[in-house]
A protein has these predicted regions:
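DEDD superfamily 3′-5′ metal-dependent exonuclease/proofreading module
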Residues: 1-631
Length: 631
């Protein structure tokens, strides 16, 4: 790999998806399905030792090998599972991704123009295709059938405690801290038959892999166009195949050759790429506002605009004939507003004519809520489906009509029990005491509560009060809504308010620092230590550095200060929980891994701080909007 700016926490992505646990379960799945085969688990991370151990295991006529090391030319791979019967090989790539059947066609898109691979499956099929190629070259005498091993979300689990069989642990090898899985061998072996028929699903992908390797050239709308910019452009010919491109890239990596991207076209996701965005745009300026930041801008139009030398929002404003935005869409007004204000360097806030009328319909006390959740591929309990939403934490700020604010919070303890139902019970205690309007930011909270209801329905008599509570505040768009249906503040902002400093984003993380930069009432109130709160009481959230307002999220204590002076030895390496995915990963670490009490307390404190500020940010947004109307 080329070094990514985000690579320090790539292991957390795998952890959050349940990749470690699914990978370990897959080993036992094949081990138990082939009880008469020799079994070898190649655990060494050393190149030479892993290759030696693999070759030793391959001397067996029939063998199941977990994580074998295979090398060819400049390539070195670790296959997840390899099943060998003579020269007949089952090559398995394990992914903690969901499927609904063993049909390879589920990965394909069938259109009048032809058959193609669905974009969401391209990275995974690329992976298994590459592994198949390397293995076939290293062992040309083998007959290889590639498989993707996935999690079938339509399968109920057949046992209790499946998730708890695998615990994430931290190990040290050659001075480096790495993640591993501690397996409850006794319980695993006692559940052999259930493990063989659990939620995992292997899918034969030989036809697709053969098409990738030997038929389809790289190019627009073809397989490996992951960035909407074919890798073949890095080669000498536009018809470079997948295999040729792989060799070109490996040669560049081996010889430390920087790939020339100056002639490359601009793809839909280049603006988020950590590698070459600055190289593609002439005279790149990080302070400039580029067209990719326009709200709901059609990313597929960016390449042709770049060819016309239209890079920035000002460029687009100066070339109205090249503007691809559709005036018949609901987003057009807001897009045009962003373009005009940005091009004119105008920081004026906009609000709709009816914003006051809409806000007058809200009932005090106002409740601002935020949930933290995670999904797990391996269920906690029998008869549950994979990827159920686990509700792990909430924060509620309640604002009374006299301006008084009170904060409530709840965070699940580390426990083998799914906390979702207790989560609902605790939330109900807070929100059922009045008829005040409940606010969320985006639809997440609505979806979480509706998901929790579905899990309660099999025992609806036992959970009648909780189900009635959920029904009183949740809704389905397009259907009749209850009188107290939650208000989506994000949608409210989209429809009624715009601040130029958000740079087109409606995220609360963008809205909060923007309003703080221009709001007198927020400066007046939050320049003093907070007189309320659970974790944030006495914090001063309005601070300036050289005349620039500091993002309040950056004022929260760093995790290294909450956990340990030696953060490198902590399992969780992120220094803040500024985004929801960081919070989700932190809870995953708390729930499914073995960590020190010091790290556990620090992570809990960080989670509580972060979630409390999320709902306080919603209070601050309301206070700012209310002050605008009073003007």
């Amino acid at each position: 790999d080329y070094k990514s700016q985000d690579s320090d926490n790539e292991f957390l992505e795998i952890l959050a998806e349940g990749g470690y646990q699914v990978g370990e379960l897959a080993k036992y799945y094949y081990k138990f399905h082939y009880p008469d085969y020799h079994y070898a688990d190649i655990t060494s991370l050393d190149y030479q030792e892993s290759i030696r151990a693999t070759n030793e295991a391959l001397e067996h006529e029939n063998v199941v090998i977990a994580e074998p090391a295979i090398t060819f030319d400049n390539f070195f791979i670790r296959v997840d599972v390899l099943v060998k019967k003579g020269n007949t090989i089952k090559l398995v790539e394990v992914k903690a991704k969901s499927c609904t059947s063993d049909d390879e066609n589920d990965f394909l898109s069938f259109k009048k123009t032809g058959v193609s691979i669905q974009s969401k499956w391209r990275p995974y099929l690329a992976d298994v295709a590459f592994q198949t190629y390397v293995t076939s070259q290293a062992f040309p005498e083998w007959s290889i059938t590639p498989y993707l091993m996935l999690v079938n979300k339509s399968k109920e689990t057949n046992m209790d405690g499946l998730n708890q069989l695998f615990t994430i642990v931290q190990t040290e090898e050659n001075g480096e801290m790495r993640l591993g899985v501690e397996v409850n061998e006794e319980e695993i072996n006692a559940s052999k038959e259930k493990i063989k028929d659990t939620v995992l699903q292997d899918v034969n992908v030989k036809r697709v892999v053969n098409s990738i390797l030997y038929s389809a050239p790289l190019g627009n709308d073809n397989f490996f166009d992951l960035l909407n910019r074919p890798l073949s452009e890095f080669g000498t010919e536009n018809s470079s195949t997948f295999i040729e491109a792989a060799h070109q890239l490996s040669d560049a990596y081996k010889n430390e050759i920087s790939l020339d991207k100056s002639g490359s076209s601009f793809g839909a996701c280049c603006s988020k790429c950590t590698f070459c965005y600055q190289e593609i745009i002439p005279n790149y300026n990080p302070e400039e506002k580029y067209i990719s930041s326009i709200w709901k801008f059609p990313k597929n139009k960016i390449p042709e605009l770049f060819e016309q030398k239209v890079f920035s929002i000002k460029d687009l404003r100066n070339n109205p004939g090249l503007n691809p935005l559709n005036p018949n869409t609901k987003s057009y007004f807001r897009q045009s507003l962003q373009i005009d204000l940005t091009a004119n360097n105008d920081l004026s806030e906009w609000h709709s004519d009816d914003i006051s009328e809409v806000m007058s319909e809200w009932n005090f006390p106002l409740h601002f809520i935020d949930f933290e959740t995670c999904t797990v591929p391996l269920p906690f309990h029998k008869n549950e489906y994979p990827y159920a939403v686990i509700a792990s934490q909430f924060s509620v700020h309640t604002l009374k009509e006299n301006g008084n604010v009170k904060h409530y919070q709840w965070l699940a303890d580390q426990s083998p029990i799914d906390p979702t139902i207790q989560f609902v019970k605790e939330l109900k205690k807070i929100l059922s005491n009045d008829n005040g309007t409940v606010f969320m930011y985006a639809n997440h909270e609505n979806a979480v509560l509706k998901s929790a209801k579905q899990r309660m329905l099999p025992n609806k008599n036992e959970y009648k009060d909780e189900i009635d509570f959920i029904d009183s505040i949740t809704f389905t768009r397009g259907e009749h809504e209850p009188e107290r249906a939650m208000v989506d503040l994000c949608r409210f902002v989209q429809d009624h308010y715009y601040h130029p400093l958000t740079n087109g984003s409606n995220s609360l993380k963008a809205v909060l620092p923007s309003i703080m930069a221009t709001s007198n009432i927020l400066k007046q109130k939050y320049s003093n230590p907070l007189a309320f709160g659970t974790n944030l009481e006495n914090y001063t959230l309005f601070q300036e550095d050289a005349g620039i307002v500091t993002d309040p999220y950056d004022l929260l204590p760093k995790l290294k200060d909450l956990i340990s002076k030696d953060l490198d030895n902590a399992l969780f390496h992120k220094d803040s929980l500024k985004d929801g995915s960081g919070a989700m990963k932190a809870f995953q670490v708390l729930q499914f891994s073995q960590i020190s009490e010091e790290e556990k307390k620090g992570l809990r404190k960080g989670l509580l701080n972060y979630c409390e500020l999320d709902t306080l940010a919603m209070v601050m947004l309301y206070e700012h909007l209310n002050s605008l109307l009073k003007k």
